[in-house]
Regions:
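N-terminal cysteine/histidine-rich coordination modules
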Residues: 1-78, 82-92, 97-143
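Alpha-helical structural motif
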Residues: 31-35, 123, 157, 161, ...
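Residues that form generic nucleotide/phosphate-binding pockets
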Residues: 38, 42, 164, 168-171, ...
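Hydrophobic, aromatic-lined core segments that form the binding pocket/scaffold
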Residues: 180-392
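Short, exposed beta-strand "edge-strand" segments with a Pro/Gly-rich flavor and a Y/T-containing core
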Residues: 24-31, 170-178, 197, 341-346
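Short, charged N-terminal helix-start/capping segments
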Residues: 2-19, 161, 246-265
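Conserved aromatic-histidine-acidic binding/catalytic patches
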Residues: 83-87, 115, 153, 320-328
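Charged, amphipathic alpha-helical linkers/stalks
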Residues: 125-220
Length: 392
């Protein structure tokens, strides 16, 4: 069996009270049954069950939260009371494992038993400490490989597609010729063509086509000829921003990050248009290209984040679902770029923080995003033209 880890996996350490966006606030913290049993069996920790709530017989219990959506066991210094009083060994799996991720690549053997071919270990970029580690890497994401596969192993089709996406995003080999947004678009184009394939052999043929530099150049020439109007691009970006943040902008955890930007979008596109709103939009149109150039200074970080998230999340055995995950990962990039534009703060700390924010909002809610696309576009797989518009 082969084990693959992202370069920084073993180096991760929680920064606890120094974290600018704690993982103890803003989402549900599931408490696994083994932890519940462990707490209840020890008279010193039995009281911890009072800080949990049941959501139903067939689902794990959750930690109770306060009005700010923070875990009740988070103290005023940003430290966990469970760890302070009882040690790391009494954390529930959710808290002990985050932001670590583990995936297994499997196949069925001759008697239809599942056999593990590869175990992959990675870190979620929703954690600001992980984001800092990604920023500190000198080049690509970096994968540490141990072990060997048996001869004759046939890796799943979706796994081969995912690995091609990672190579694309990181600008490896022939993909180095293209900009980050071009590589993102080529990846989406590849997925669309794979979805149209009838057989696995056709998918392999498609992967070969996307290893041909002349074919890639032709595809980018096609997209560049579209030249979407800045008015259309800005309107769709603002609409997307508004839709994604509508729920979160009023939540205590997320309001400080997205409320002001959402208000700016509202002022650009009021229910009844005004001359003042039109003037603000015109100013935005005029500075968009300059913004993209400034944000591109963080392309090396962005490509590592994208590659890391693709490595972690695009592991479905269904190409359609894999494409939905890819869309969500790219939307994290689009939303971060748009937020920085709206706020006008291009500091490294701000870019990292907003990237972590949108990995939480979007990446950890991929199923919800698929439902959103289905509801608004009548298909959870976006059209390529619309995808290109958002990247423009």
């Amino acid at each position: 069996m082969v084990t693959i880890k992202t370069q920084s996996y073993d180096d991760f350490r929680c920064i606890a009270d120094r974290c600018p966006m704690t993982c103890c606030q803003g989402w549900s913290i599931k408490v696994d049954q083994n932890t519940c049993d462990k707490w209840q069996k020890d008279q010193n920790t039995a009281y911890l069950m009072e800080y949990t709530v049941s959501r139903g017989e067939d689902v794990p219990r959750e930690m109770k939260t306060n009005e700010a959506d923070a875990c009740l066991l988070l103290d005023n210094q940003g430290l966990c009371k469970v760890v302070k009083r009882h040690g790391d060994g009494y954390l529930c799996d959710t808290c002990a494992l985050f932001p670590r991720k583990k995936n297994q690549i499997t196949e069925l053997n001759d008697v239809d038993e599942e056999k593990v071919l590869i175990e992959e270990y990675s870190l979620s970029s929703a954690c600001p400490a992980v984001m800092e580690m990604l920023d500190g890497l000198e080049s690509s994401l970096g994968l540490e490989v141990k072990g060997e596969c048996e001869d004759g192993i046939h890796f799943p089709m979706e796994y081969r597609v995912r690995n091609t996406l990672i190579c694309m995003i990181q600008g490896e080999s022939i993909y180095h010729e293209f900009s980050l947004t071009e590589r993102i678009m080529l990846g989406f184009s590849l997925l669309h063509e794979c979805l149209d394939c009838d057989t696995e052999e056709n998918v392999d043929d498609c992967l070969e086509v996307y290893a041909d530099i002349e074919n890639l150049r032709e595809k980018m020439e096609y997209w560049e000829e579209m030249e979407p109007a800045i008015q259309d691009t800005m309107e769709e970006l603002c609409q997307t921003f508004w839709n994604v943040t509508e729920y979160y902008k009023e939540l205590p955890m997320y309001r400080p990050y997205v409320y002001d930007a959402a208000c700016k979008v509202d002022s650009w596109y009021p229910e009844r248009d005004t001359e003042a709103a039109a003037a603000m939009r015109a100013q935005a149109y005029g500075t968009w290209e300059q913004h993209k150039q400034k944000f591109a200074e963080y392309d090396s970080l962005a490509q590592r984040i994208l590659a890391s998230e693709i490595f972690s999340d695009c592991i479905s055995d269904d190409l359609g679902e894999l494409t939905e995950y890819y869309q969500a990962i790219v939307l994290e990039y689009i939303m971060t770029r748009m937020s920085i534009f709206l706020l006008g703060d291009y500091s490294k700390e701000k870019v990292q923080l907003y990237y972590s924010l949108y990995v939480r909002i979007i990446g950890h809610n991929a199923e919800g995003m698929a439902e959103y696309w289905e509801e608004n576009f009548e298909d959870s797989i976006l059209e390529q033209e619309y995808f290109y518009l958002l990247l423009s």
